[in-house]
Design a protein with these regions (language model features):
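Phosphate-handling active-site elements
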Residues: 76-86, 112-131
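Membrane-embedded alpha-helical segments that form the functional core of polytopic membrane enzymes
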Residues: 87-95
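ATP-dependent small-molecule kinase catalytic core of the GHMP/sugar-kinase superfamily
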Residues: 2-8, 12, 16-18, 22-32, ...
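N-terminal beta-alpha supersecondary unit
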Residues: 3-83, 96
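DPxDG-like acidic metal-binding loop motif
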Residues: 68, 97-123, 139
Length: 177
């Protein structure tokens, strides 16, 4: 077990989104072009008791409803691990802005705990686990440029986008996710 793992959780934007219909499971069938951006959170994993979450962002739930907590609980359950971790979320991604802040943190927790617990899981396995947590989480495992299909769980990598300056704005009282 490592002493401390630090993972970067990059925000993502949708460059294109097509809603292709409603699925039997209640989700929408989509085709999206997704792109990681430089805005990111930092996820630090250290020893703790059970699953502890702390954050620098006031108002963010740190309990069992937090997606990072759910990611840790899922991985511990699937691989029969008694979790003793403290997960610190240093948030810079805006909440409810459609930038996958929670999803990217959950993906970073999966990647980080994979290392912390020496599970040696491949990206495909992590993406499959990520799909149990949410539609954006599988993309956030590897990030970059990709097409996401299905409900977002089918990831088809694209060539890297050239470096581009993007300005993101979020109105204070408008939640988009």
């Amino acid at each position: 077990m490592a002493e401390k793992i630090i993972e970067t959780a990059y925000a993502k934007i949708n460059l294109g989104l097509s809603i292709l219909g409603k699925r039997k499971d209640g989700y929408h069938e989509v085709s999206m072009i997704m792109q990681s951006v430089g805005l990111c959170d930092e996820v630090i994993i250290t020893e703790g008791e059970g699953i502890q979450i702390s954050t620098n962002l006031e108002g963010l739930t740190c309990g069992k409803d937090n997606l990072a907590y759910k990611a840790a609980a899922l991985l511990a359950e699937k691989y029969n691990i008694t979790p003793n971790v403290h997960i610190i979320l240093n948030k810079k991604i805006f909440m409810a802005a459609g930038l996958a802040g929670g999803s990217s943190d959950a993906a970073a927790v999966l990647r980080g705990l994979n290392k912390y617990w020496n599970l040696n899981l491949g990206d495909d396995t992590l993406e499959t686990l990520a799909a149990e947590l949410g539609s954006d989480v599988p993309f956030c495992i590897c990030g970059g440029s990709a097409i996401a299909k299905g409900r977002g769980e089918i990831i088809v990598p694209l060539p890297d986008m050239p470096e581009t300056i993007v300005v993101l704005a979020k109105l204070r009282n408008l939640d988009v996710s």
